[in-house]
């Protein structure tokens, strides 16, 4: 049986966006892609994805957090993954395990860029309860 679940991927780096979309399609999921926060918001106004993957820093330093917040506000049950290189580039650390970060980071999983496809596949399946 073909998988009909759709994953929204938003990243301003076209190479990262293409690679992530390629991998997710190879996992058997449909993908919708957007190259910026604004385009992601437009898609979210019309489509309810089964899961969303957002880059953190796009046109603004907090674009991914804003998209996560808006996604959870409109579709509270849609899992959100933030994939970013911010932690390795800036040394900033975010944790979905601490109360302070969990209050304002409306994501279900936070992953550093460079994630192996098998790790990403495992996280997607876990969040979608596959």
Label every PLM stretch briefly.
Residues 10-11, 34, 52:
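Conserved sequence signature across two-component system core domains
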Residues 14-32:
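Two-component/phosphorelay signaling modules centered on CheY-like receiver
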Residues 1-6, 112-130:
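Non-catalytic signal-transmission and effector/linker regions of two-component phosphorelay proteins
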Residues 66, 86-112, 118-122:
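Alpha4 helix (beta4-alpha4-beta5 surface) of REC/receiver domains from two-component response regulators
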Residues 42, 65-76, 96-99:
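Short amphipathic alpha-helix used as the core "switch/output" element in two-component signaling
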Residues 11-12, 113:
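Acidic di-acidic motifs
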Residues 33-42, 63-64:
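Helix N-cap/capping motif at the beta->alpha junctions
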Residues 47-53, 58:
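Active-site beta3 strand of CheY-like receiver
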